[in-house]
Amino acid sequence: MVSLRDNIEAQPLSHNRRIRKNFGHINLVADIPNLIEIQKNSYEKNFLQLNIKDSERKNKGLQSILNSIFPISDSSNIANLEFVKYEFDTPKYDVEECSQRSLSYAAPLKVTLRLSIWDIDEDTGTREIKGIKEQEVYMGDIPLMTKNGTFIINGTERVVVSQMHRSPGVFFYHDEGKVHSSGKLLYSARVIPYRGSWLDLEFDAKDVIYFRIDRKRKLYTTTLLRAIGMSTEEIIKFYYNSVTYKLVKNKGWAVKFIPQHITAHRLTSDLVDADTGNILLKAGQKITPRLAKKYSGEGLNNILVAHETLIGKYLSEDLRDPASDEVLAKIGEMITADMLNVINDLKIKNVNVLVINPQSGPYIRNTLFADKNQDREAALCDIFRVLRPGEPANIEAAESLFYNLFFDTERYDLSEVGRIKMNSRLELNISEEVTVLTIDDIKNIVRVLVELKDGKGIIDDIDHLGNRRVRSVGELIENQFRIGLVRMEKSVIERMSAGDVDTVMPHDLVNSKILVSVVKEFFSTSQLSQFMDQTNPLSEITHKRRLSALGPGGLSRDRAGFEVRDVHPTHYGRICPIETPEGQNIGLINSMATYARINKHGFIESPYRRVKDGCVTDEVVYLSAIEEGKYKIGQANSKINKDGKLQGEFINCRVEGGNFVMVEPYEVDFIDVTPMQVVSVAASLIPFLENDDANRALMGSNMQRQAVPLIKTDAPFVGTGVEGVVAKDSGASVLALHDGIVEQVDSNRIVIRTLEQKVDGSPSVDIYNLLKFQKSNHNTCINQKPLVKVGHYVKKNDIIADGPSTDNGEIALGRNVLVAFLPWNGYNFEDSILISERIVKEDVFTSIHIEEFEVIARDTRLGPEEITRDIPNVSEEALRHLDEVGIIYIGAEVKAGDILVGKVTPKSESPITPEEKLLRAIFGEKAFDVKDSSLHVPSGVSGTVVEVRVFSRRGVEKDQRAIAIEKQQIEKFAKDRDDELEIIEHFVFSWLEKLLVGQVIINGPKQVKVGQTITTEMLKGLSKGQFWQIIVEDANVMNEIEQIKTHYDEKKEALDKRFATKVEKLQSGDDLPQGALKVVKVFIATKHKLQPGDKMAGRHGNKGVISRIVPEEDMPFLEDGTVVDIVLNPLGLPSRMNIGQILETHLGWASINLAKKISTLVKEYKNKHIGIEQIKKFLIELYGENINSILERPEEEIISFCKKVSKGVHFATPVFDGAKVQDVKDMLKLAGQDPSGQVKLIDGRTGEYFDRLVTVGQKYLLKLHHLVDNKIHSRSIGPYSLVTQQPLGGKSHFGGQRFGEMECWALQAYGAAYTLQEMLTVKSDDVNGRIKTYDSIVRGENNFESGIPESFNVMIKEFRSLCLNVKLEVTSS
């Protein structure tokens, strides 16, 4: 068999990869995890369990919901519907087709259900199976995730944002002294389940403990304890210890000496040893823990206390008469002086009392005695009355309600996470499968709450990431599914009871619409299902990695306090402390850190390198915030020697609570993987982030997401090394699916013959259709360009095509431009930006924006609307761009008001005049009974038509344009099929040739003689089909040929079948909305050049608006004549403290000067003045070891590499581990520049040098989405507000500009009374004045008069609503 590796003539594509000079010192042991894996794992792996066999599916996600809802039985238990398995069919349309046809990308869910019918004997009650029916039931279309982690819903791309919410479990906290005037801390506990009722326990100001369910009226906690079955005695014995007082004749009582009960208190009486009678300490003295320990060690067992000491203590068991066994006082009662006398009289020798002291307060006992409920029944009825006020309370109903509240798995679910948290907080050992409350839980929650009040333990920190978890897509949709299936369950039970069960099939019982509507509602309207931010690839990735605290079950903006929004020590390595929106959502919407991932319980984990005996290993361990608290963790920049040992006497480590300690190297457990793990993806793209102020870094990371993809992309000279990862994971670029060789390339597609052979040894073919000028969600342009050439050898996951905002496989949001920091005639006042005309002329910051316009031809009451060129009362000039069908041509240049699609609508009949009758008789009916309802280009839009899509309803005849588009599409499908077949045929026939050459012919086509030996020349004379007719002597060869033919035929048949399916789908017509006959979509591309008013920004939060475009000859220039592109204001730096931009500028200056140096060396090499060794030496000096792979290649390739860096050398300065100031100076020296990075600059207008040296360098600038074209508009005639009669505001309403209070002051200051009057009356809301002014303009006059503004009338009406009748009285002067 021929090996495909034989004919790899190509050089690997990896040779084209960009090499950056990296300033990082820390060796990376862990790769950045896939940036959108959070979305894909959650939905595809955990929820759908898509490509997993039914038998291997775990009980989670969809599987667990179906298992929990089914089996469903009817009320009489005769019918039983069980779940067997589920599977997904293939989606009807692929992702691209769904977005084009405005459909949802979804797959039909087929669930196999088994209906068992039972026969029940009425006398004996025995059951036996009567019949079993199993059937596959369609349960609706379930949205699928695209390969980029998004959903296509109704044709638009949406993202489901992960939600941060409080983890289920029990939480203890206090009110910080806010409730009670004395500042006393009132402690409380809250049990938060994943699903079910909340349980709160709280102390009041009198130290009585209450509980409430779902924030209803509060009850005594002992009512709850009685409701779970505890008696008074059990309650007291569980929460209190007991001590026995023994009577010592004529001396008092002897009691066991327990040091902790009396330490740190002044003695009220002498401390006497009961056994010896010795006085150990006098009254009034303080007993210290050391003294107590000493006495205990010396054998002090019992101490003597005075007789009346018992007064005020509480009984720990019933006090009984020794003679009659009569109960004298109940357990828990306080011993009074009277009771003590009774004890003396009856000569009771032993009295058991509760241990109550400052370490153990009487709260439970006090609550017990305040509570009127004395038994379980009364307690349950009391709870019932609070939860169901107005309903009669009986014990069965109360019992059932209480059980359903906390102990029923159907209605209450703590979830596995909640159980784990509960066990760890209460120190219990209950199985993780028990996800309801237990009696032990409730008893121990009260115990811990009382201990907190007694000063033992600490309260929980709600903002700790161990107490907040992430609900990702899969879990959010799982919850919706559960709601839908619970609703469906009710309808199934109803149908079971209603129909004849014997004849019914499973599909008759299931109504899938209920489930579908719930899922649809979630994707369309939920606060967490959002329209994807698709401005550029970075904004897509960030949106998918966003964590929101808002949404259903989360916080609300208005009630979220400062603590929730603040950065917490546990955010380190998990949530980015920088990237969050400015404004009211600050801190509520966060971004996951670069290396963070979410574990199976929903907690965010961060990676660390394990340290063993002071030696750093390469083992990477992911820890959650809870686990991290147990260890000492060093920083990534801790000094490590060659053997991997931590250097230095002490290492700075993080410990629980966010504190830092200095420990010896052998005590360190872990160190950070990299300093970059602290920040998010957007922040990790900012070079010199460590030199920027945090507020500006926040703006920088937010503004990168608003950068518009430009026509010409340009990766930053000064990057951070993460650019490639972002481009790859965003899905903007095209990745090779398999190793292979490029067979064909054009701007629309790439064909690759793969090197992974099939079972039959034949190659498979990958065809990548590139996206050309597609519209994104934010009207930016998605366009992919191939990076490979024919013959290139590509490896799996190599980038073979660039997408929007990517350059050679790296993210490129802006352009490198030459900037100078200097004031220029006041044009860069307040962050304004001055740009050179070259930038506009050479389209440096030009971007393409695509607008979509849609017209629908509907079936109306009066008849169908029609797409046509035949429009009444429209000139031929207006129709010049339309084809014969009435749809605009592709490539037409259009401006506001032009017709895109001609459409006429039937109009109702109106009475006809005799003249009209005559005209109709002469010219026919048609022209009069329709009105023009064509699609026009809206105001403010102009550009080129780049695409037209026509969709026709099934059964409606297609027009010429639709047929032409269809034909074009079929040709494309056919080309894909033919190219694939050609590659397979080439392989098959060259294999056949190898087998046949040298064989002896037995039989064959006419051209060949029997007995002849086959040669290559002979085979060249035969057609491909005749190869199969040859029969040779060797039976083994014939067998092999037979196998090849079978495989070839199968392959060909499969290709034809796939082609036929695609064509059939294309020709079958479209599913259009109700009443629509035809839909035409027109896409117009507009080129936006940079102009004054556009917003630009750097990566460091330095933003500004363009103030002026200056001719090149007027701009400042360098001594070699290079003109500066952009002039920025140096005053924008000191107060903003984003110094990173200056370091970036200096390093950029080194970059272009090093590139010039390399170009000079290449020139000298070509002129044979120097050899290749000098170039190699300079490259090693510049790049270090990074460059070795290139230096080993032939000379031409080294020169070709040098040419690639001729515009600028690319640097990588990783966040917190990048170039220091000295490194920048070294680079400037290597480039032959002054280490200050400043140069002499010449003024373009005068030709003279500026007085001082100026900072000049290459800087990376972005053009943001806030374009002046989309902001400014002018109003001529437009709508007025109904009440005030003033023009509306805003571009969308075609509004006017408000002449506000300050503008009035300006006119007053100038004394321009008439102008002011005109502004406030006729130009605003004087209705009569407006009409008169219009009349006078029409008559060509210049005079007008103002009347009363409408707003004055509104004010009078407002007065009248207050019952004040205000009139305007005009008296003649």
From Swiss-Prot:
Keywords: DNA-directed RNA polymerase, Nucleotidyltransferase, Transcription, Transferase
EC number(s) reported in the record: 2.7.7.6
Recorded GO CC terms: DNA-directed RNA polymerase complex
Catalytic reaction(s) noted: RNA(n) + a ribonucleoside 5'-triphosphate = RNA(n+1) + diphosphate
Keyword Glycoprotein in record: no
Gene Ontology biological-process annotations: DNA-templated transcription
Molecular function terms from GO: DNA binding; DNA-directed RNA polymerase activity; ribonucleoside binding
Effect caused by changing L109P: In strain: Moroccan
Ranges that cross the membrane: none
The keyword Ribosomal protein appears for this protein: no
Gene3D superfamilies: 2.40.50.100, 2.40.50.150, 3.90.1100.10, DNA-directed RNA polymerase, beta subunit, external 1 domain, DNA-directed RNA polymerase, subunit 2, domain 6, RNA polymerase alpha subunit dimerisation domain, RNA polymerase Rpb2, domain 2
Family annotation (InterPro entries): DNA-dir_RNA_pol_bsu_ext_1_sf, DNA-dir_RNA_pol_bsu_external_1, DNA-dir_RNA_pol_su2, DNA-dir_RNAP_su2_dom, DNA-dir_RNAP_su2_hyb_sf, RNA_pol_bsu_bac, RNA_pol_bsu_CS, RNA_pol_bsu_protrusion
PANTHER family from the UniProt entry: DNA-DIRECTED RNA POLYMERASE I SUBUNIT 2
Entry function: DNA-dependent RNA polymerase catalyzes the transcription of DNA into RNA using the four ribonucleoside triphosphates as substrates.
Quaternary context: The RNAP catalytic core consists of 2 alpha, 1 beta, 1 beta' and 1 omega subunit. When a sigma factor is associated with the core the holoenzyme is formed, which can initiate transcription.
NCBIfam families, A to Z: PRK00405.1, rpoB
UniProt similarity note: Belongs to the RNA polymerase beta chain family.
Name under which the protein is recorded: DNA-directed RNA polymerase subunit beta
The species this protein was found in: Rickettsia conorii (strain ATCC VR-613 / Malish 7)
Lineage of origin: Bacteria, Pseudomonadati, Pseudomonadota, Alphaproteobacteria, Rickettsiales
